[in-house]
Curated annotation (Swiss-Prot):
Catalytic residues, chain numbering: 28 (proton donor/acceptor)
Entry's Gene Ontology cellular component terms: cytosol
Annotated protein name in UniProt: 5,10-methylenetetrahydrofolate reductase
Similarity field: Belongs to the methylenetetrahydrofolate reductase family.
Reactions that this protein is recorded to catalyse: (6S)-5-methyl-5,6,7,8-tetrahydrofolate + NAD(+) = (6R)-5,10-methylene-5,6,7,8-tetrahydrofolate + NADH + H(+)
Record has Calcium as a keyword: no
MF-aspect GO terms: FAD binding; methylenetetrahydrofolate reductase (NADH) activity
GO biological process per UniProt: methionine biosynthetic process; tetrahydrofolate interconversion
Pfam family, one: MTHFR
Binding site for FAD: 89, 119-121, 133, 153, 157, 160, 166, 169, 172-173
Cofactor: FAD
Organism name: Buchnera aphidicola subsp. Baizongia pistaciae (strain Bp)
Binding site for (6S)-5-methyl-5,6,7,8-tetrahydrofolate: 121, 184, 220, 280
Keyword terms of this UniProt record: Amino-acid biosynthesis, FAD, Flavoprotein, Methionine biosynthesis, NAD, Oxidoreductase
């Protein structure tokens, strides 16, 4: 098996050798919930920081204040330890404006200058949000001159009426001060490219960064896609058929798929990529190794 991996990674680097122009990469983590998972996260960070990413980001998780504190604490630790810009996700779904102002001021005073502003998931469909992402962006800008990234949805947000509504909403976020949009993960590249072209057509000129999900566990992917409106192509299901208990082969196939996606997106002019790591480094590191010191 070691020989297989050795040959595979040599092939991987061969495939990516023609990517020579500057590329920005970033990696997303979630806050660890115990000592063991935090130890694992630091091992992941130690490896991925060698790739000199543009930034790391840390999810907000659920909307509880305890979870927000976990995000804040780990963001500060990562930035201090690595010296790399670390971006907290901030959701507004279950927080008041005053609470959000306190969080924003605390981040700014701690040296955090970049926030990923999100509404957050609604778990009670009978509860209509009082604050949306565009409101959060305005609130953050009223506190300080944060750099603000937002979410975008090539396959349309699950709650959006249609693609046009999604574009209108993204444009409102840009007008409020967003300077980057990171997309939900996807496997239909044509869908992403149509979304990018639609953004350009509607004078949305910020960087649209594709979210890349390196597959290591197909069952886990299906779980995520079921709540995020991400379509799973039939060919992808066929690729992983019968591999539920073969994670090594799954990782190799997942790497190959992600490599092909990066190659095609690069050929279409994309120069920034955001990796959803799930606090794992192996596949993301292998894919990005050729990009070392490019950002």
């Amino acid at each position: 098996m070691k020989l297989v991996y050795k040959n595979y990674h040599e092939t991987l680097n061969q495939h990516l050798m023609n990517i020579c122009e500057k590329v920005n990469i970033s990696f997303e983590f979630f806050p660890p919930n115990n000592i063991l998972s935090e130890k694992n996260l630091w091992q992941v960070i130690d490896k991925l920081k060698l790739l000199t990413p543009k930034f790391f980001s840390v999810t907000h998780g659920t909307n509880s204040k305890i979870r927000a504190t976990c995000t804040s604490n780990i963001v500060k630790k990562i930035k201090k330890y690595t010296g790399i810009e670390t971006v907290p996700h901030l959701t507004c779904i279950n927080s008041t404006e005053e609470e959000l102002k306190v969080i924003a001021k605390t981040y700014w005073d701690s040296g955090i200058r970049h926030i990923l502003a999100l509404r957050g998931d609604i778990f009670n469909t009978n509860c209509k949000p009082k604050i949306y992402a565009v409101d959060l962006i305005k609130l953050l800008k009223s506190i300080a001159n944060f750099e603000i990234s937002v979410a975008a949805y090539p396959e349309v947000h699950p709650e959006a009426v249609n693609a046009k509504y999604d574009i209108i909403n993204l444009k409102r976020k840009v007008e409020a001060g967003a300077t980057r949009a990171i997309t939900q993960f996807f496997f239909n590249i044509d869908c992403f490219l149509r979304f990018r072209d639609l953004c350009v057509k509607n004078n949305i000129t910020i960087d649209i960064v594709p979210g890349i999900f390196p597959i290591s566990n197909f069952k886990q992917l299906l779980k995520f896609s079921s709540v995020s409106n991400v379509s799973i192509p039939k060919w992808l299901c066929c690729m992983f058929h019968g591999l539920d208990n073969d994670l090594n082969t799954s990782r190799i196939i997942g790497s190959s798929i992600a490599i092909d996606m990066v190659k095609v997106l690069y050929s279409e002019g994309i120069r920034s990529f955001h990796f959803y790591t799930l606090n794992k480094s192996e596949i993301s590191f292998a894919i990005c190794k050729i990009l070392e010191n490019k950002s």
